């Protein structure tokens, strides 16, 4: 599978200001595979060290930060001869060894020619628990589940992958009949690499669902492993409640919907853990669409989305025929699945931090707001071809400086006040509005 982040890794390798790299991401999004494949393609050899339950290597880091001694230990561990500019050293599961994280500072200062890449699944939590982060001494990249474009490329549709990111609305509209079924397929399979690989191996959607169910179980075990029993119970309850929140017309996360009498203070630390582990995206409400958006965010009002649309379908046991073919009884949750997909693409494909807006004293709501370099995008999401946009129109009239965008299954069209962009063409930001055209 081709991952878009490979190009960023090559840029890192060739940068004259290269520092040790930290590749962040939730468990099972493909960090280990990507780093190994990167090393195979672009280095003479790879020295791979997994620090999870690796007592021998953890002891070496505990002894101090003598770089020559650590490199010797790496060679003994891997059997590889390590040379600057030729070898990629991979320190996997670095969150399991805090001293290894600290050592990156010394690799930066004393061995800048050695390419060291660390991968961490729960790194945000490790840092917040008191581990010294090597500020200013590392480069960092984030890896997410496969985007729709990456999924297209992986399924033998590389041409379509390029098309949906192109600035050619006429061509995109012409091939909607070919792209739309692939998008519905992505809704079911999602972007977890192992689930996608299982589907590709035999072409059976149920193979992907089996992997998704296993990943969901693994995630809950992770919660139980890293939190106290009480904290884990609260975190898992919040996690399991996400589909029911997204299935409501008002998708704002309400603690009282988790359990009768539930209080925010009991669940907040668990939600923070889920966010730092990369398992959820917290979409905060903003009070006004000013630049930048973040000062207007309200931490007390938010929506929670999962990291992957396929996992959301697995959590609610959506049948493949329902997702691929549609169903009258699927109409309400279809909106939740579509918003999950859009949120995921905004983060992984576009690099945005998504927010949302809702009126204080009325039912008006904008599904997502995103900040470009010099623009705010007000985004409405439609699961099919329903193009009524009452809330978006009112919001645009009140805030004429925003770019109004509607994502739907309908083809690209431009009106005097907004643009409709097909859901599968989200990567083509040039279609969104003025900023992309400059």
State where each predicted segment sits.
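Short glycine-rich substrate-engagement loop in P-loop NTPases that contacts/grips substrate
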Residues: 53-84
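Structural recognition of the conserved hydrophobic beta-strand(s) that form the central parallel beta-sheet
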Residues: 90, 115-121, 142
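Pre-Walker A adenine-sensing motif
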Residues: 1-16
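Hydrophobic positions on the alpha1 helix immediately C-terminal to the Walker A/P-loop
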Residues: 34, 38
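Interdomain motor-coupling "hinge/lid" segment immediately C-terminal to the ATP-binding subdomain
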Residues: 127-247
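Conserved lysine of the Walker
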Residues: 31
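Accessory nucleic acid-recognition modules appended to NTPase machines
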Residues: 197-365, 369-370
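Conserved catalytic cores of phosphodiester-cleaving nucleases, focusing on short active-site segments
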Residues: 116, 346, 366-385, 404
